[in-house]
Amino acid sequence: MSITSIRALLRSAVSLARTKPLRFTNLKDIKLRPPIPPTVENFQVSPDHPLWQFFPEGNQTTNAIREQDDLDHDSREWTSAELRQKSFEDLHRLWYIILKERNILAREVRLAESIGMRDVKQFNNIDYKLIKSLRRIKQVLLERHIAFERSQASPSVQEEKNEYLEEFSERYLNAEGKEIEEMDEKLDRLQYAFFGIEPTMDIETLQDDIDVNFIKGMEYSSNLKAQKYNKLNPESELELPLRGPMEELPFLLFDVEDAVQQVKELRESGQSRELYKIETIPFLSKAIKSHLEGQE
């Protein structure tokens, strides 16, 4: 299509549009609704709306900004000595309670400034106490982290840990009769205490759970289970030690007999191999996630 024909088409479209003016008929029959004044009653807000968390009394809050007398002026910040006595769960919970209160204060201060209220000093004073508490929580957590790293780096602590693992391995392999089930339960607890391997894994926390310590724990417990299986089943031809995470993982996810069968199938198919370090965590994350999704 040429430029001339396009221009002609545009002109005809404009001219046709002009020949059809907008007209209203029967104007007397048109009924107009009265205007709706903008009031709070015209809006319905869910009582469970997340933004209610920014108000001190939630959906029961009656004032957008608290009066000075309604503020808690007598409270004080948490001391480091008090925080050191709290568990990790308590510190985590306390951190978010304080953070929520800071968000409430920040909303009130921002609103007060937007409508010209200048006296927000009391709000800021309370916020300063909350900030000091948050800083002390971080300090206490840092102290614990440093203490943990020093304890892990201590040769004596590591030697004691290795001695205990060797002693446990001997008791586990020599267990007989009813002791076997009891030692299996102890192994599950040991995995969690020494290596952080949860008895029940969760997809939501999987990325945080799998680390170098997790891999070490899986190696220890899987080879221990395989050795026990060979001892109870002398006819078994399972060659030990296991060849890395690919063969160790089945012992973490399945019963020992099923795990042994899977390892044999891997070896017979030629798929079993030792993983590079850079492959290990992605492989474990993908395999465990797939297993957990299959159970849902």
Swiss-Prot record:
One Pfam short name: MRP-L47
Example of a GO MF term: structural constituent of ribosome
Keyword Mitochondrion: yes
Gene Ontology biological process terms from the UniProt entry: mitochondrial translation
Keyword RNA-binding assigned: no
Main location: mitochondrion
A GO CC annotation given for this chain: mitochondrial large ribosomal subunit
Subcellular location: Mitochondrion
This protein's UniProt keywords: Mitochondrion, Ribonucleoprotein, Ribosomal protein, Transit peptide
Transit peptide boundaries: 1-19
PANTHER family xrefs: LARGE RIBOSOMAL SUBUNIT PROTEIN UL29M, RIBOSOMAL PROTEIN L47, MITOCHONDRIAL-RELATED
Summary of subunit composition and partner proteins: Component of the mitochondrial large ribosomal subunit. Mature mitochondrial ribosomes consist of a small (37S) and a large (54S) subunit. The 37S subunit contains at least 33 different proteins and 1 molecule of RNA (15S). The 54S subunit contains at least 45 different proteins and 1 molecule of RNA (21S).
Family the entry assigns: Belongs to the universal ribosomal protein uL29 family.
Protein name (Swiss-Prot/TrEMBL): Large ribosomal subunit protein uL29m
